[in-house]
Amino acid sequence: MGNSYAGQLKTTRFEEVLHNSIEASLRSNNLVPRPIFSQLYLEAEQQLAALEGGSRVDNEEEEEEGEGGLETNGPPNPFQLHPLPEGCCTTDGFCQAGKDLRLVSISNEPMDVPAGFLLVGVKSPSLPDHLLVCAVDKRFLPDDNGHNALLGFSGNCVGCGKKGFCYFTEFSNHINLKLTTQPKKQKHLKYYLVRNAQGTLTKGPLICWKGSEFRSRQIPASTCSSSLFPALESTAAFPSEPVPGTNPSILMGAQQAGPASDHPSLNAAMGPAVFNGKDSPKCQQLAKNNLLALPRPSALGILSNSGPPKKRHKGWSPESPSAPDGGCPQGGGNRAKYESAGMSCVPQVGLVGPASVTFPVVASGEPVSVPDNLLKICKAKPVIFKGHGNFPYLCGNLNDVVVSPLLYTCYQNSQSVSRAYEQYGASAIQPISEEMQLLLTVYYLVQLAADQVPLMEDLEQIFLRSWRESHLTEIRQYQQAPPQPFPPAPSAAAPVTSAQLPWLASLAASSCNDSVHVIECAYSLAEGLSEMFRLLVEGKLAKTNYVVIICACRSAAIDSCIAVTGKYQARILSESLLTPAEYQKEVNYELVTGKVDSLGAFFSTLCPEGDIDILLDKFHQENQGHISSSLAASSVTKAASLDVSGTPVCTSYNLEPHSIRPFQLAVAQKLLSHVCSIADSSTQNLDLGSFEKVDFLICIPPSEVTYQQTLLHVWHSGVLLELGLKKEHMTKQRVEQYVLKLDTEAQTKFKAFLQNSFQNPHTLFVLIHDHAHWDLVSSTVHNLYSQSDPSVGLVDRLLNCREVKEAPNIVTLHVTSFPYALQTQHTLISPYNEIHWPASCSNGVDLYHENKKYFGLSEFIESTLSGHSLPLLRYDSSFEAMVTALGKRFPRLHSAVIRTFVLVQHYAAALMAVSGLPQMKNYTSVETLEITQNLLNSPKQCPCGHGLMVLLRVPCSPLAVVAYERLAHVRARLALEEHFEIILGSPSSGVTVGKHFVKQLRMWQKIEDVEWRPQTYLELEGLPCILIFSGMDPHGESLPRSLRYCDLRLINSSCLVRTALEQELGLAAYFVSNEVPLEKGARNEALESDAEKLSSTDNEDEELGTEGSTSEKRSPMKRERSRSHDSASSSLSSKASGSALGGESSAQPTALPQGEHARSPQPRGPAEEGRAPGEKQRPRASQGPPSAISRHSPGPTPQPDCSLRTGQRSVQVSVTSSCSQLSSSSGSSSSSVAPAAGTWVLQASQCSLTKACRQPPIVFLPKLVYDMVVSTDSSGLPKAASLLPSPSVMWASSFRPLLSKTMTSTEQSLYYRQWTVPRPSHMDYGNRAEGRVDGFHPRRLLLSGPPQIGKTGAYLQFLSVLSRMLVRLTEVDVYDEEEININLREESDWHYLQLSDPWPDLELFKKLPFDYIIHDPKYEDASLICSHYQGIKSEDRGMSRKPEDLYVRRQTARMRLSKYAAYNTYHHCEQCHQYMGFHPRYQLYESTLHAFAFSYSMLGEEIQLHFIIPKSKEHHFVFSQPGGQLESMRLPLVTDKSHEYIKSPTFTPTTGRHEHGLFNLYHAMDGASHLHVLVVKEYEMAIYKKYWPNHIMLVLPSIFNSAGVGAAHFLIKELSYHNLELERNRQEELGIKPQDIWPFIVISDDSCVMWNVVDVNSAGERSREFSWSERNVSLKHIMQHIEAAPDIMHYALLGLRKWSSKTRASEVQEPFSRCHVHNFIILNVDLTQNVQYNQNRFLCDDVDFNLRVHSAGLLLCRFNRFSVMKKQIVVGGHRSFHITSKVSDNSAAVVPAQYICAPDSKHTFLAAPAQLLLEKFLQHHSHLFFPLSLKNHDHPVLSVDCYLNLGSQISVCYVSSRPHSLNISCSDLLFSGLLLYLCDSFVGASFLKKFHFLKGATLCVICQDRSSLRQTVVRLELEDEWQFRLRDEFQTANAREDRPLFFLTGRHI
């Protein structure tokens, strides 16, 4: 029979496979059993079994539930109403009794609503605009997720008061709904009704019936704000069970999955509610929250309901999340916290973790009574986790039990894990079944050690891996194949049936020695819970830690729950459900009510001499007047090395100077780089160019020590001086303006900061949020709690206020060591704006050399696990044993109280033992004794009395006060007040130190101020002290280098989140000297310890007779580590532990192993185990507890290598025998510790600070935390890193990968950004609702780095470099060079003597001689131009520069940009946005391309130019009508007088400077209208147009792409003249004379940045005595002044002096000079019509043009009192031309000597224009052509019609061949050479014969080709006087197609 039908298991195979599976999983380190159950089914019937057994869909999933359960799936029948009673009212909106039920009518009337009922709005088809009011039993209404409504109905009529309607049909008749279909409560009960602040009944949230259409509605804030807070205070608790979905960004519906945008936003002022059964407006107002109305998706989709009729009042689907029940509040059900102020979208994950608030769970069925005195009997409150299905009511002694829904939430999340594969179309992949979930949970609990607590993260990963493995084939199939339109048939989703589950679970639990007990129920969970309570009361579960209750009676589903009954686990779990506020409240209550008195009384019974206080008093009386002999030698008075003055000297005490370390500088530069990248982005979110200076505000947590510490950092960093504050103004009050303590007074100071930022738009304000993870509570929570705690949500209210977010000049920098809570899916900080502290090395190479090495958490763990040294992380086994024992004795006391009292007792006993009461050694632990001995003896090792600091961390402030008072009392009784200080460190108060110690500190730190007091912990350097550090969280306080012990045994070990753990351990972070390796130092410490201590430990092992001692003896390193860390020899033998254990009747054997196993310093990983001989190294499981922990479980299955494990103890030891063994060893232990005391402490006679520099502090941890920290996963990542990152966030999904040790900080950030979401109380919770797609704030950055590593110094350095950069942005490097050749200036009798003339007098100016000498320093290496006035000596010329130094060595000065500066493309400001074409209100300016052609005879062809004209600039041009062809550029009239525009068009030729060219003349022109044209090459047109979209551009023809600046100048001038002619013709038609058209243009370099004017104060008109000053003015001012000159039309060329700080008075004394002009010229194109620029030139074309203009008899005038500043631009310009070889593989540099070659040679040709090669060659090697001219300034080279630079050693004489030209008299000059460059027909033989040459002078003729060369020689009859040789012909090194230039040289006969 049994195996004959489909789906039945094969019994024999089943038992065999299951047995092997369970045994293998128990032996394995892997927590996740292989999914073997799929093997157990007959494959042929797999699908059918799956559909029948595993794919359960409750009938209740269907919404169409009918009256009486008679409905079928067919179409609904028309509903017939029962006949109405005669005489009753039938009016719509009234009941049959005639009472008005309409909401609008009775909204203000009082209503009698029984307990458990809610007022509901009924929708009537006949009254669509009205709601009818009725009262309904809320058990028949759905919970917030649309589930758990009992079938049926129970309601009352609020009109007539009739009660007891049991059928909705009957009720709908009574209220006259008049329906044509069968009444359904889901259809007609539509809204909850709530009362607003005025007490008026109003429509509230939609009732979320499952499957109904979901609508996002919100109650107006005014509706609920008034009564929300009182309800929270009294009864409401926020449920932590969210919608059962994994990803909050996806709204899962029963029939659809909507996008994230459909997610309803949580109303900030509205919270979910829990009812206590009383109907009050306050409760009703909180009735429902729309966010919870998310429909629950079916695991298998919507299936047809073919099941049997439904039974009335049957519960909803067990998949439904439970809603709080009003009738039976569970224990702790009233707890609420900030995290719960809004509804969680995603469940809590940690069974252990903060914010795991306990909430009532919905119940069904018969109630279960909780026995009285359960806590007294069990010694701990059992914690019951709801699992699957329905959970019964609890009643009776509810205070002794805790119920939590967290496990249910975990189950629900893992049920939906397959949704991640929906993108592959994998609807066939089923979630893990409920049966498998429960079985895996049992497996997990079985493998937990006795001292382990279950973690939800572990369980989630087990489910995930099991699911992955069981569906690996399907997953791969869908990942590799495209989505299929029709998915295959479902595979088996539940290989284990509910009927088999209890037996399988019992079988799995059978091997764990009853640690896990399984109870099977026949009917309901109530039966199993009652059974569990009975067993607990009878003491039959004394050895049981977990009870699994399973009810599999229902055909398609299971009910389950898990109760934690182990005393250790239950205590930790129940305490972890308390919020921090509740935790403090609980401790306060126990202290205030005197509950702890029993604990104190117990301690007083331990001492054999009686109460410790009596012993202290006795000791005090005996030793009054003198100090104990053991401490008589004061550390200060002992013999020591003295300095000259007789003061003791200590070489180890040197306070480190405040200096910036390489790491900090690197981080500061990274921060600066990120700020610059924000500014450089196209989003225009930060305009660095508009800021002139930096200001800042540092916001810190409300800690006085942190506040003072930050003030000191700011003071010593010098940042305020860097920001411009004068040294004399540096006062403490001034520094305090920059640091804001976020307390109740912060708002005023912050408002002043905002006001300051608003008033100073040109100041960049950096808002630094230090310790940014501290307060992340949303300001909406403040709205709820503002009356009770005004500081709630303060950070959000200040730093996230609208003013900060919108201010364009505020950058917010969050700084934290624990950034995880700021890295969620809703974060405001872009991942690109995160800056992580850099790693110290890469690939083994130090990136930044530092003399100190940072020692943080990872280094602590690494050193502890490595085994190379004494462990720095330790736990105190005897302390933990004592706490565990006392926890059982005092179950009603919080463990924090017990731990604090035990630790204080240990410290007191240790102090007494060290002070001369050796018998007290038995009442402390070795760890505490070590701390105390080193604390008291360290001052003896130093001549100055320097000692060490002991940090005692007591998070709970009231307990810290208790500890302080007790230790101070003991210290006073022992007369140790001057030996060490006890400091109570509290965030709210500063540092208080006794006068004696203040005096010592002043002496050590050489402080003369008698009023000085230490205000930070850093100032306690070297002070022997115990710092009792209180506060729930550290607030960024730094600790001194003298910190030697970090005692964290009292931290809240139940609060297992990553931030909390790392924050506490961060207190020990340290910088150690890089000079001494840590391991070496640690080994030295091991050598200092005494051998007797080690032997006593081994002897102890032999005494206890364990096999582990043999392996421990074999491994010296392990013995050493055991000695360093364990307290077995003394603490386990202490009478305190003995009596605590002995007096505990129900003490479990696990108490002993808990203390005994701790003899090993930590659970050993495989690397450590492998070091013991004979041990086999096994890989650590990637998930789950470390092997040492699993070894501690009671009665483990025997394993082969059990005997070889270090520290293994026999678990089966009776309490009596253990006590007797411990007692018997007390004598030997006390004697063994006594001699050890002298050698345990610091041995060498050296200051403790010497050792402190070499080694980090030793950290003592609670055992639970220790195990969490040192256990690692397969990648080596500490398990603590995988915990929930912060209490204010939640995991977004169970379906998430694990963190890996190989992840960088950036990868971890991306991980948290993907897998965490903020809780509703988190300030980022509502970020995605702001409508922005990305949600990132553009000016917000995050700096993260390990604690105590120097982040404060880094961001202060960042402020400094940012300030420097802003100053640098407002500064430019301008050329600052003295004019050259001043001593060669023409010394003529003629000077321009009218010093005060604003414009030159034409007649006077004409008489001035032209100064041929070039004075512009950029031409320092140019050939000197000679005239007959000069007598030049060779020494008058300075040393020429090397060619490569020409640019590098030019002198510059840094100048602050004025408001009249020209800018490049990086400048942005509001004023010139429109000018630039980037204004946000405008689109990029449209431009049109216009061709403009004109003929030029010299070029022999028509020139066609192109104008790019933006639409906004078309008014400057004339276009033909109607064709729109460009005709001309408009020119003003000479007679126009306007101060609003500049008449002269400005042309700026440019190349290679599209970003850096100074083309933004808006500010330079002071906003005046002007015409500015950029002249660009064709190939650069697009890039210039991109950067300057609103500028007119003149595009040169493509033939000029490789031309030099001469071509641009040539075309500008010719175009301008041609345009002048066109305008004259056009305006002549309008009656305007041609001479009235303005003929001037400006040709400006693209590097002109600012313009200046010289103000001269002279004593008289002709006096040479005067004073002058120079100031910056606008270009508009200069241009309008020059354009207003009366005789300006007579000048051909005007220019300005080049600015120099070295300008002499003589240079500005004369206002005008007739000389060369450069850089910025004003050209009269009319007068210079016949003078052209040379279009071929690259260099010196302006000098050449100046000489041409002068020789044509035209006037050049330089305004000496105007100057132009030229910016140094390192890109573009003439540097754009690179001379390279045409042979691509020739990488050798080309030198100028290679620029020419012999014709027809095999020379390598160059890729450069021939003209450039010519000019460059002549500049560097012209002496080869003119050897006689070298340094021969009396005999220059004659240069005809051109000026070419022949180098600084050769002088030239320029003459023009044009008729009537002005030339110098050359009759008395003998020339050393003749240069004929492309001579035209004006040069003839007769012209050359006028000049005389030295014998041997050389000639150089340059022509376009060889034939022209010969023709020129013949035409000029050169062979008459010059000798030519064939070898004297050359060409530029160009290929033939590049048209080389040809040279011919000759020698004068």
UniProtKB/Swiss-Prot annotation:
It is found in: Membrane. Residues 59-68 have a biased composition (Acidic residues). Belongs to the GREB1 family. This is Protein GREB1. It comes from the Eukaryota. The chain crosses the membrane at residues 1868-1888. Its main location: membrane. The gene is GREB1. Signal peptide: none annotated.
